[in-house]
Amino acid sequence: MTWLSGLYFISIASLVFCVIGLILSGIILISRKFLVKTHACKLKINDDDSLTKTVDSGRTLLSSLLDSGIPIPSPCGGKATCKQCKVKIVKNADQPLETDRATFSKQQLEQGWRLSCQTKVQHDMCLEIEERYLNASSWEGTVVSNDNVATFIKELVVSVSPEHPIPYKPGGYLQIRVPPYKTNTSDWKQTMAPEYYSDWEHFNLFDRTIDNSLLELDSANKAYSLASYPAELPVIKFNIRIATPPFINNAPNPEIPWGICSSYIFSLKPGDKITVSGPYGESFMKENNRPLIFLIGGAGSSFGRSHILDLLLNKHSTRDITLWYGARSLKENIYQEEYEKLEKDFSNFHYHLVLSEPLPEDIDSGWDKNDPEKTNFLFRAFELGQLSKLSNPEDYLYYVCGPPLHNSSILKLLDNYGVERSSIILDDFGS
C-alpha cells in the first residue's frame, strides 16, 4: 500500500498547489482593481471635441486608443520594432523614451511625435492622428478552420459578416485582438495533421502550458498579412507561424515565454470567435505594366498569395508574374497545388519552388538535390535561375516577404544588381 499512499500524497499536494495558484491569481486581480489607483484622462483628437475620448490612466496610449475604437496599427505587437504606431502629441507630451529617440529626429521629438505602444497615459493629452486610422474599424469573425499547412505554420480561416465586409487591399494586414487566455500545446493536436507530430515531439513542444490569463486586454495585439484576396470575402485567411522559445537540448527554453499572439492563434478551434481591426498596409500593388517577381519565404506565403491570386483571378492581369518560394522541405511548402494549377491556367505566371533542406523522402519522390536552382537558399537559386540572366533587372518590381534573414539576403542581392529601393516592395513587420 506504500505506493498508493505516495500517490494519494502527490494528488493532495497537486490539489493544494492548484488552489494556492488560484488564490494568488485572485489576489493579483483584486489588487489591480482596487489597489492600483487610476484616474480618468481625456484624449482630444485632431482638435475635434466630438473625437475626445475618456480613458483610464496607466495603460499605453496604443491600447487606450484601440479600446476607444481607434485601432492604431502595431504590426509588431507593441514591441517598438515596427515603428508604425506613431502618434503626434501636440499638448502634454512626456519626455521621449529611448525607443522614441531611436525612431524620430530631434525636430520630430520636439513636435511631440511618440510611439504609442510605449507611451503611458497619465494625464490629459491632445493628439494628431491620421484620418485613415480614424476610419479603421473592428470586426468579429468566426473561425472556420485552423489547420497546420507546415510544421510550425497554420492557415487561419475566418468568416466575417457579409453585410459588413472588410475593405482591404491585397498586401494589406489586419490586427488580431488577443484576450486573456490559457492553453496547453497538446490541445493544438485537434487542428494539426499527424504528419507534423514527430517534429513537435522531437523538440518536446507538446504538453506545454501557456498561461496568459492575466494578460492586460489589448496589450499584445499583433498584425498579420492577409493570405486571402478581397474576392474571397466573407472569408479571410492568414498564415501564422508559432513563436516558440529558443531551443536548449531539443526543448524550449523554460525561461523564455512563447509568443503571446501566435500561441493564442494556435489555440483557436472552429467555432471560436475572434476580433480583428484595420485594414492597414502600405505594401500594395503598383498599378503599371512592369513585370513582377515575388520572392517569398515561410509564412510570407500570406503576402504572396493575396497579391498573386488577386492579379490573376480577379484582375486578369497580363503582366509577367514570377513567384520564387522557399521552404525547407516539401512538407513545409505552402499552396504548391494552387500555384501549379495557376501556372497551367495562366501563361504569364511562372512558379519556382526552392528547398533548402529536402528530406530523404523528397529525394525519393524525385526532387533533384543536385540542381542549385531547386535545392539551395532561395536568394542563391533566384540569382542563378533568373536574376543573373536579366538584361535589365531594374525594370522589374520585386515583392519580398519572409523571415528576417530571407529579407536581408534578398535586399543585399538586389542592391548588388543595381535595383533601386523604390522598385522593391518589402512586407516586413519588424520581427
Curated annotation (Swiss-Prot):
GO terms for biological process: sodium ion transport. Its EC number is 7.2.1.1. The chain crosses the membrane at residues 10-30. GO terms for cellular component: plasma membrane. Keywords: 2Fe-2S, Cell inner membrane, Cell membrane, FAD, Flavoprotein, Ion transport, Iron, Iron-sulfur, Membrane, Metal-binding, NAD, Sodium, Sodium transport, Translocase, Transmembrane, Transmembrane helix, Transport, Ubiquinone. Its main location: membrane. It is an enzyme of class 7 (translocase). [2Fe-2S] cluster binds at residues 76, 82, 85, 117. Binds 1 [2Fe-2S] cluster. Residues 136-286 form the FAD-binding FR-type domain. Gene3D superfamilies: 3.10.20.30, Nucleotide-binding domain of ferredoxin-NADP reductase (FNR) module (3.40.50.80), Translation factors (2.40.30.10). One of its GO terms (molecular function) is metal ion binding. It holds the Pfam family Fer2. It catalyses: a ubiquinone + n Na(+)(in) + NADH + H(+) = a ubiquinol + n Na(+)(out) + NAD(+). Its cofactor is [2Fe-2S] cluster; FAD. It is a single-pass membrane protein. Belongs to the NqrF family. Composed of six subunits; NqrA, NqrB, NqrC, NqrD, NqrE and NqrF. NQR complex catalyzes the reduction of ubiquinone-1 to ubiquinol by two successive reactions, coupled with the transport of Na(+) ions from the cytoplasm to the periplasm. The first step is catalyzed by NqrF, which accepts electrons from NADH and reduces ubiquinone-1 to ubisemiquinone by a one-electron transfer pathway. This is Na(+)-translocating NADH-quinone reductase subunit F. It comes from Chlamydia caviae (strain ATCC VR-813 / DSM 19441 / 03DC25 / GPIC). The lineage of its organism: Bacteria, Pseudomonadati, Chlamydiota, Chlamydiia, Chlamydiales. The gene is nqrF.
